[in-house]
Amino acid sequence: MPSRFFVTGTDTGVGKTVVSATLCAALDAIYWKPVQTGTREGTDRATVMRIAGIAPKRTAPEVYRFSPPVSPHLAARLAGKRILLRNINLPKIAPQESLIAEGAGGALVPLNERDLTTALMKRLGLPVLLVTRTSLGTINHTLLSVAALRAARLNLHGVIMVGKTNIENRKAIEHYGQVRVLGRLPLLPQLDRKALIKAFNSHFDRTAFVG
């Protein structure tokens, strides 16, 4: 059964792309970032191909690409465009293929003057993985994001933490958020396919990512 998820985070820079690359490498999934900003500094698609060791054919092209490293709604406006949800549809892939879709920033990042990223998640209908830090402040940030996802009536599949071990923060998130923490991705000294797969096998239960 294929694994298909939408990856969001509590903040920009929290580790969504590395988590997405890890899942693509470990689950042999296709990578897709429908809305990409900051292309002048490179794309997350290129990063995932490089560190996960996957070919271009194992990725789907972005629907919207913008050069400035700013929020999608602003990047589109600066380009004289508007992001339309109706233009963003799941890529056409074989039924048996797994898919990892990565959002731009967090769950409440605006895409246009009306729609937030939660609206895109709802349109795509994929179970959501929330990426969060393990460090101080993560409880508040994670619980706020969990509340936002549930308010939007999205299927929150679980939380993935990134960073050093912090058992107390993990327990607090599971208790107060009533959500599963699926595992923790440590800060890796080297980012390549072998290291990502090893980290996944050491810190996650593969069965938690089935369908």
Indicate residue ranges for each PLM-predicted region.
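N-terminal phosphate/diphosphate-binding loop that engages ATP/GTP or pyrophosphate donors
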Residues: 4, 18-84, 90-93, 97
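Hydrophobic anchor at the beta1->P-loop junction of P-loop NTPases
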Residues: 7-8
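Conserved glycine(s) of the Walker
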Residues: 14-15
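Short internal beta-strands
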Residues: 33-34, 129-132, 157-163
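Switch II (G3) loop of P-loop NTPases
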Residues: 87-112
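Inter-motif core of Ras-like GTPase G domains
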Residues: 112-135
